[in-house]
Regions:
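Acyl-donor (CoA/ACP) binding surface of acyl/acetyltransferases
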Residues: 1-43, 47, 76-196
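Short loop/turn motifs at secondary-structure junctions and domain boundaries
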Residues: 67-73
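Conserved GNAT-fold acetyl-CoA-binding loop/helix
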Residues: 44-66
Length: 196
């Protein structure tokens, strides 16, 4: 219910900076290429992210930053903690079934609640600014931490599919999840991010 949404959320155009309790989410820039490549160049991340290659070079990071600069919806964010990049979160509006939430964190930042905090902020943008009615997401069956993030954000399990993972070079089972605008709205008391 939009009348219950704090005023900072009710603005036109894509968010450029989101602030949560501990994180800053902002558009990535070419100045971030080295940090992105350093964080993403870990096989454990690539094995749980469909399109992330391994090894992950600065050329990959440069191409990704260039592509995210063309994201007119402003739904791709670099996640920062204490002014240092720790990962990425965003919504793919070109996904087949519904806009799809995706994220990854550098391994040193796993298990601290950052994924859930960043995902909630990106979800808010998708529903409030993007006008999404539903969001989709997926997590490898072998990745319970990612499934936990999705469940904490209100996503509901919708089935299992096979998806190809670039770093694995094969298809692997993925739990699929959905989040409707109605469920998101009812869970909105999870706190809010502040936009600048």
């Amino acid at each position: 219910m939009l009348q219950d949404v704090p005023k900072p959320f009710l603005r036109q155009g894509p968010a450029s900076v989101l602030e949560t309790e501990r994180l800053t989410l902002r558009r990535p820039s070419f100045a971030d290429v080295t940090a992105i490549a350093r964080l993403a160049n870990d096989r454990r991340i690539a094995e749980n992210t469909k399109r992330l290659p391994h090894p992950y070079s600065q050329d990959h990071a440069t191409a990704w930053v260039r592509a995210s600069a063309n994201d007119r919806r402003g739904s791709v964010f670099l996640i920062e903690h204490n002014h240092s990049p720790i990962g990425v979160v965003g919504v793919d509006w070109d996904a087949e079934e519904a806009p799809e939430l995706g994220y990854w964190l550098g391994v040193a930042h796993w298990g601290q609640g950052f994924g859930t905090e960043a995902a909630k902020a990106a979800i808010d943008v998708a529903f409030e600014d993007g006008g999404a009615e539903n969001l989709a997401a997926g997590a490898r069956v072998a990745n319970p931490a990612s499934r936990n993030i999705l469940e904490k954000c209100g996503f509901q399990w919708s089935g299992v599919e096979l998806h190809r993972f670039e770093a694995l070079g094969c298809s692997t089972p993925v739990d699929r999840f959905r989040l409707s605008r109605g469920v998101w709205s009812s869970l909105k008391n999870w706190g809010s991010s502040v936009r600048r």
